[in-house]
C-alpha cells in the first residue's frame, strides 16, 4: 500500500506516520532523506541535485520525481511506502499522476490553525536533557523550570507564535490545495484515484490513530 499523509506542521503527522509504517511494515519516505542519501552515495541524480543546491537553487520537481521513482523500486518498498512531505505542491502531485505512480490512499489530518498554534507555542524545553513540557497539556510542577534540575525552560524559536503562523501560511498557500486536488480526483474517477480521507486531528493520539486505521482498513 502506498500512502500519502497530509497535514499542517503540528498536526501530528510524525507520530501517526510511525504507527502506519510499523503496522503495514512499509518505510516512511521523505524527500529530504532521499536527497541526502543520493548525495552521500554520489549517484548521478545525487550529483545533479548537489550541483543545484551548491548554486543556492531549489532542486527541481523533475529531479525529486526521479529520486522518488528510484526509491519506490527498492526492495523494502515492495509492500508499499508512506510518503512524508511529498508531494508538497500541485505540480508534484500532477507529475506523480502523469508518471502513473499508483497511490492507494491519501489521508489528511485536519487540525484548526488556532489549536496548532496553542499546541506548538505552548511547548517548553529543558535544553540539557531534551525534556519537553507544555504550559497547558503537560506543565512543569513549577512554572518555567524543569521538574528534575530546577533549571529554566525555554521556548524554541520554531515554536514562537509568529513562526508557527508563518509556517501555517506557507502550508495553506502551497500544500493545502493538494487536499482539494485529491478530493476532486476521487469524485471524478473512483477507479483510478487514490482513496481520500480527511481525519479530524483533535483528541488523543490513540483516538486519531484509531480513526486513521479505520479508514485504511475499510
Swiss-Prot record:
Enzyme Commission code(s) on record: 2.7.4.3
InterPro entries for the chain: Adenyl_kin_sub (IPR006259), Adenylat/UMP-CMP_kin (IPR000850), Adenylat_kinase_CS (IPR033690), Adenylate_kinase_lid-dom (IPR007862), P-loop_NTPase (IPR027417)
PROSITE patterns named in the record: ADENYLATE_KINASE (PS00113)
Keywords, alphabetical: ATP-binding, Cytoplasm, Kinase, Nucleotide biosynthesis, Nucleotide-binding, Transferase
Record pathway: Purine metabolism; AMP biosynthesis via salvage pathway; AMP from ADP: step 1/1
Region (NMP): 30-59
Reactions mediated catalytically: AMP + ATP = 2 ADP
Domain of life of the organism encoding this protein: Bacteria
Any one Gene Ontology BP term: AMP salvage
Pfam families per the UniProt record, alphabetical: ADK (PF00406), ADK_lid (PF05191)
Cellular location(s): Cytoplasm
GO molecular function, one term: ATP binding
Domain notes: Consists of three domains, a large central CORE domain and two small peripheral domains, NMPbind and LID, which undergo movements during catalysis. The LID domain closes over the site of phosphoryl transfer upon ATP binding. Assembling and dissambling the active center during each catalytic cycle provides an effective means to prevent ATP hydrolysis.
Membership in a protein family: Belongs to the adenylate kinase family.
Subunit structure of this chain's protein: Monomer.
Function: Catalyzes the reversible transfer of the terminal phosphate group between ATP and AMP. Plays an important role in cellular energy homeostasis and in adenine nucleotide metabolism.
Name listed for the protein in its UniProt record: Adenylate kinase
